[in-house]
Amino acid sequence: MPVDTLSPGAPATPALPFRLRTKVPGYLLPRPADGGARKPSAVERLEADKAKYVKSLRVANTRQEPVQPPLVRQPLFSPGPRGPVLTPSRRVLPCSGRRPQLDLDILSSLINLCDSPVSPSEASRTPGRPEGSAHKVPPATPPRPPPSTVAVRRVDVRPLPASPARPYPSPGTTTTSSPGRPPGLQRSKSDLSERFSRAAADLERFFNFCGLDPEEARGLGVAHLARASSDIVSLAGPSAGPCSSEGGCSRRSSATVEERSLDRVPYGVSVIERNARVIKWLYGLRQARDPPTTEG
């Protein structure tokens, strides 16, 4: 039977059902052998029938382009670590097929070294080196101080703050305080020195305000100036010294805190009283400066 008279037969693979045909991608479906026309898609069919449901002529003449996904632009420089770029001069040469053969003498010496106990002289040798290089002594490094001395130096450089030791008072200078004296009447030396320094600062400030020369003030006498200006600084508070009599101490010890606060003199001087004291003080300075004239 001649070959030309043979007609093309049916495809070898049976036709797929509709259920499987919708799930299988189009490029896997069998194509017709005769190269028939492709079935138009729904978009193409709507585009062909646009004149039926579109009233505007301008819209009917336009063609809708298929929607394409946006292109994701990759950054020029990725934030992650990049491998080193090899220039033509730095390209890695392909390694040769032969690998360097291991020296049997070195291997045997290493095995013997592991089996035998290590001596101090052999411990200084570096494994993997020939015997000639083992005799080289490394340069001596300066000895480092032990960690204990370093810790001691650190303690010496930054000592902990220690409270100052108070000197013990001698038995001859100790004074017996009365047991009935309240703690409010005891004044420390620092409090008294602070009061004296404050009074001296106020006195110097008053001299500068009045325009008095400090040398002239020293020439007039410190005792006279201090006595004349004692009324300007402030009113004297309750006495900080020891009690004059035992009766006064007992009266103070029996008083309460409220009574002591009422007995205190209020701090502050009126403007009129202050001006009067200034005039009195300036008059005293004038009398001290001008010698008394004798009438004769």
Curated annotation (Swiss-Prot):
Q: What is its main location?
A: cytoplasm
Q: What are the entry keywords?
A: Cytoplasm, Cytoskeleton
GO terms, biological process: mitotic spindle organization
Instruction: Enumerate the InterPro entries for this protein.
Output: FAM110, FAM110_C, FAM110_N
Where does this protein reside within or beyond the cell? Cytoplasm; Cytoplasm, Cytoskeleton, Microtubule organizing center, Centrosome; Cytoplasm, Cytoskeleton, Spindle pole
The record's GO CC annotations read: cell cortex; centrosome; cytosol; nucleus; spindle microtubule; spindle pole
* Amino acid composition bias (Pro residues), ranges on this chain: 139-148, 161-170
Q: Which Pfam families match?
A: FAM110_C, FAM110_N
Question: Is Secreted there in the keyword field?
Answer: no
Residues of the region (Disordered) are 61-97, 117-192
**Superkingdom, taxonomy of origin:** Eukaryota
Similarity annotation: Belongs to the FAM110 family.
The record's subunit annotation is: May interact with CSPP1.
Can you name this protein?
Protein FAM110A
